[in-house]
Swiss-Prot record:
The modification N-acetylvaline is found at residue 2. This is Peptidyl-prolyl cis-trans isomerase A. It is an enzyme of class 5 (isomerase). Belongs to the cyclophilin-type PPIase family. PPIase A subfamily. The gene is PPIA.
Length: 164
């Protein structure tokens, strides 16, 4: 089985920054990968298109995926509001790792983050399910609009997304 690839076209205050593509590790975390894939295509009638990265901390990560409240308190999975931690096989080994944001054990919804550094303290707490395939330079460009408290200086949005 070939792991799926999805893309995000990223904008800053409506100006295109470029495309980031992700390999989703469906071979290791099929349920988590399928959630992200389906939210990227919007095939269930809801998903990431038009949503923003509400929290960007340079040297740490870019967090997005709250397409219901747009502030980090919302989002939902394709399985219902929340779903369980599938496993912690994969680790936060460095920049480009794609992992699920959560509010404690078994609270995965749609929020995710892209690591911009090694974040091993998140191992065993957040489910890693993919990695940046192409466009890490775009993630680095997004990072420049972040701050230490996570507030962004420009609105960083997913203007388009889907499966490749």
């Amino acid at each position: 089985m070939v792991n799926p690839t999805v893309f995000f076209d990223i904008s800053a205050d409506g100006e295109p920054l470029g495309r980031v593509s992700f390999e989703l590790f469906a071979d290791k975390v099929p349920k988590t990968a399928e959630n992200f894939r389906a939210l990227s295509t919007g095939e269930k009638g809801f998903g990431y298109k038009g949503s923003s990265f509400h929290r960007i901390i340079p040297g740490f990560m870019c967090q997005g995926g709250d397409f219901t409240r747009h502030n980090g308190t919302g989002g939902r999975s394709i399985y219902g509001e929340k779903f369980e931690d599938e496993n912690f096989i994969l680790k936060h080994t460095g920049p480009g790792i794609l992992s699920m944001a959560n509010a404690g054990p078994n609270t995965n919804g749609s929020q995710f983050f892209i690591c911009t550094a090694k974040t091993e303290w998140l191992d065993g707490k957040h489910v890693v399910f993919g990695k940046v395939k192409e466009g890490m330079n775009i993630v680095e460009a997004m990072e420049r609009f972040g701050s230490r408290n996570g507030k962004t200086s420009k609105k960083i949005t997913i203007s388009d997304c889907g499966q490749l």
